[in-house]
């Protein structure tokens, strides 16, 4: 019972922290992404291929937090569902957009499988919604036994993203 209670308390602490991590305000988006990757790797020893360019976020908080949430949900899906041993996370910022590539070598899935579980598993729907809120594009490819790749492009023109969603 005590161990179960400890796990619940730890889950609550992690949830509260992840609502708006201190690293986000203090150190920025790059450090927040690095912290998410550390969290992903805490329980398992993934082989990690990580490249994060200077991804400072000078736009408003809404944009940055939504982008953070999208990445967070992608990484949580890997941790919860993929059974992967390797994870690739590349994030760069060009003059026009953020480019994020997240890939694993896990068990993969089919879109039919996701649609069948739509009422109980909505991680991918949350990811798509976040990308849409930022006027971005997302491409998800997955196959049973071949892992999953998520390719996200988010334009830096915040005005068009906010205008689209007003």
Describe the residue ranges of each PLM region.
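Conserved ATP-binding N-box helix of the HATPase_c
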Residues: 64-86
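Conserved DHp (HisKA) dimerization/phosphotransfer helix of two-component histidine kinases, i.e.
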Residues: 1-19, 27
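Short beta-strand/loop element within the Bergerat-fold HATPase_c
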Residues: 86-96, 103
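Conserved post-beta-strand hinge residue in the HATPase_c
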Residues: 105-107, 122
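ATP phosphate-binding glycine-rich loop and adjacent ATP-lid/helix-beta elements
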Residues: 114-144
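Short beta-to-alpha transition helix within the HATPase_c
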Residues: 6, 23-44
């Amino acid at each position: 019972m005590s161990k179960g209670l400890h796990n619940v308390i730890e889950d609550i602490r992690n949830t509260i922290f992840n609502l708006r991590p201190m690293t986000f305000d203090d150190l920025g988006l790059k450090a927040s992404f690095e912290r998410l990757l550390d969290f992903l790797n805490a329980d398992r020893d993934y082989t990690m291929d990580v490249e994060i360019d200077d991804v400072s976020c000078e736009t408003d908080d809404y944009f940055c937090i939504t982008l953070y949430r999208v990445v967070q949900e992608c990484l949580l899906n890997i941790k919860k569902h993929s059974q992967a041993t390797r994870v690739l996370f590349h994030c760069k910022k060009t003059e026009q957009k953020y480019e994020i590539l997240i890939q694993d070598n896990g068990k993969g899935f089919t879109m039919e499988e996701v649609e069948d579980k739509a009422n109980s598993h909505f991680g991918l729907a949350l990811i798509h919604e976040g990308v849409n809120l930022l006027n971005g594009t997302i491409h998800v490819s997955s196959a049973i036994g071949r892992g999953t790749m998520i390719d996200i492009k988010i334009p830096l023109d915040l005005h068009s993203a906010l205008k689209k969603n007003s």
